[in-house]
Amino acid sequence: MRHYEICFIVHPDQSEQVPGMVERYRAIVTAKGGSIHRLEDWGRRQLAYPIQKIHKAHYVLMNIECDGDTLNELEHSFKFNDAVLRHLTVKMKAAVTTPSPMMKEEKSKSMMPGDAAPAAPAETAAA
């Protein structure tokens, strides 16, 4: 079995459907003996360029191990799902389980203590 990294972008109106979609894709992979090494939900983010007059979309990243038939079935389900705006599959040499740079960036932003401190004086000044 080979290792793949898959990133897909979901229409923002369908953001609440993402967990169900991920479970469906997880079932496709695991049904044929594959495994998911990393699954990251990046949430709603700004697109680099508009797709179908949409400027924001929901991003999901998966690192999986599967055979060619499973990958074809997965990509087929991406193509015929109207909620998936774009998808990209990259073949990897080994399984990737570490957090992606996007998640590291999000985690560092959320852990910065400086974010909470400036917000408090601004609120007190307004009151």
From Swiss-Prot:
<keyword id="KW-0689">Ribosomal protein</keyword>
<dbReference type="InterPro" id="IPR014717">
    <property type="entry name" value="Transl_elong_EF1B/ribsomal_bS6"/>
</dbReference>
<feature type="compositionally biased region" description="Low complexity">
    <location>
        <begin position="110"/>
        <end position="127"/>
    </location>
</feature>
<protein>
    <recommendedName>
        <fullName>Small ribosomal subunit protein bS6</fullName>
    </recommendedName>
</protein>
<dbReference type="GO" id="GO:0022627">
    <property type="term" value="C:cytosolic small ribosomal subunit"/>
</dbReference>
<dbReference type="GO" id="GO:0006412">
    <property type="term" value="P:translation"/>
</dbReference>
<dbReference type="InterPro" id="IPR035980">
    <property type="entry name" value="Ribosomal_bS6_sf"/>
</dbReference>
<keyword id="KW-0694">RNA-binding</keyword>
<dbReference type="InterPro" id="IPR000529">
    <property type="entry name" value="Ribosomal_bS6"/>
</dbReference>
<feature type="region of interest" description="Disordered">
    <location>
        <begin position="99"/>
        <end position="127"/>
    </location>
</feature>
<comment type="similarity">
    <text>Belongs to the bacterial ribosomal protein bS6 family.</text>
</comment>
<comment type="function">
    <text>Binds together with bS18 to 16S ribosomal RNA.</text>
</comment>
<keyword id="KW-0699">rRNA-binding</keyword>
<dbReference type="Pfam" id="PF01250">
    <property type="entry name" value="Ribosomal_S6"/>
</dbReference>
<keyword id="KW-0687">Ribonucleoprotein</keyword>
<dbReference type="InterPro" id="IPR020814">
    <property type="entry name" value="Ribosomal_S6_plastid/chlpt"/>
</dbReference>
<dbReference type="GO" id="GO:0070181">
    <property type="term" value="F:small ribosomal subunit rRNA binding"/>
</dbReference>
<dbReference type="GO" id="GO:0003735">
    <property type="term" value="F:structural constituent of ribosome"/>
</dbReference>
